[in-house]
Curated annotation (Swiss-Prot):
The gene is ARG2. PANTHER family: AMINO-ACID ACETYLTRANSFERASE, MITOCHONDRIAL, N-ACETYLGLUTAMATE SYNTHASE. Feedback inhibition by L-arginine. One of its GO terms (biological process) is L-arginine biosynthetic process. Present with 112 molecules/cell in log phase SD medium. This is Amino-acid acetyltransferase, mitochondrial. Pathway: Amino-acid biosynthesis; L-arginine biosynthesis; N(2)-acetyl-L-ornithine from L-glutamate: step 1/4.
Amino acid sequence: MWRRIFAHELKYDQPNASSKNLILSVLNTTATKREAKDYLSKYTNDSGQHNHCLFFIRDLHKVAPAILSQFSSVIKRLGMLGLRPMFVIPPSPTHVNIQAELLDSIVTEADLKPLHLKEGLTKSRTGLYHSVFSQESRFFDIGNSNFIPIVKPYVYNEETASEFMTKDVVKFMDCLCQGNIPHIDKFFILNNAGGIPSGERNDNAHVFINLSQELEHLSSSLSHNISTLTKREPRSQNLLHRMEVYVKKDEISSLECEYHDHLENLLLMDKVLSNLAATATGLITTVKAAALSSDRKNPLVYNLLTDRSLISSSLPRFKKKDGEIDSPANMFDDHAWYELPSQQVNAAPSNSDAVLVTTVLKKGVHIKTYDYKTLTQFNSIGLPKKFHVPEKGAKPSSNSPKLDINKFKSIIDQSFKRSLDLHDYIKRINGKIATIIVIGDYEGIAILTYEGSEENSFVYLDKFAVLPHLKGSLGISDIIFNLMFKKFPNEILWRSRKDNVVNKWYFQRSVAVLDLSIDLDPEHCDEKQSQFKLFYYGNPQYAKRALRDKKRLREFMRSVRDIKPSWENEKNIS
């Protein structure tokens, strides 16, 4: 955090020709087949659902007119793609009317009709709040789709017949999105600072946030940063550091306000998304990024079409620099060990500005981790009796989380489209389980084990599965890999069939890949045909050491290569 200071007409019934061309163009360039299918099922006429996006834009009056004009074109494009915008103005003692005028111009320039609604909420005599979105539902009928609501942050009090500007915008937005409201599929917060900052990404924005998992930690971290800035304490008692605090006082004040907004944005996202469908998505970015004309670079359009961020959140934050790690390819004759160069991640991509300032959020899924080295009847449900252990001493607490073996097997069977030999598999992993990660109600799962010699073991991703209908959605794969990398930051290995269509995705998340068919030890003819590739993820320190250690590499490769699959009728494949 301190580095930043101390370092220098809307139609839904039949799209016109330009709209069709736009849809085809964008789908051809940004979406996978699954994403295209999901988009078409949700946003075309046949879905029978009118989709809306809710905008909350901070400091719109500070944005250059040229950017506002470009943003107007994006609003028009979103409408063509089936997403009707609605705007809520943030409370401000001086700028509400100015922002209302600017939004009026933006909507008008997009060939739409602004509909100004002064009171977003009505407080009844009983103390209950009622949203204008539910009270004025007639404005959201398909026949009125050209009318774009612009809601001011006022509350009308029925008991006193008066209105007042809200002082609690989080509560205001929470109440606004309750009740029988239109279907809101996206919640966009635009500002000048961008998404929620991440220390792991050099204070650039988090790529993806699973609120169910990360809200408490992130809100605590932001609150701590605010507290630190408020104290105005120097980095040390050194005279220069004390002078820095005085000289940079305006920047510190500005950053403090910025972090207050970040915390408020996070809480806004949590409250609003809690009131919407589980599939709803939140996105925080800058107005400048939201105004980009390129469909590949614009985070709003890209998220509408794919329901994900511009880049994946589970991509490694480090890669080897050229010449930093000696390539071990020459150790194994002409068989190559592939390493991703540093520019794949660290160099600015073509859409770098938007990537670095955009955070995508989901209310998300609950996550459970089972750190049991051995599965027993006391920490699991449905475990075959042959794996039961004698009860010794005090009986384990019945409140401790238990792994559901039936669901465990079911998700693996469905994901891999083959039947797991449960007895054989548990026999193989029991006693050396590193962790088991379960997403939601067994919608995603990862089983990690310790492999290799006991004195020099390594973490191995033995099974990674997502229910077929959820692959590519909710960021489940990214959530699992992020958890793995955080839990085991030094190194993780996994293998995949050579013809696996997911290998490109795996390749992007590894720092090295090896064909397991190579001769591991030419002197002793240790060569076997294998249908697998080995993927290696490691931080720079571990990777540098491992990739130079021929003995360690052979241990990796031999251990992973010789693991026998535990599928029924498929025991002899290697």
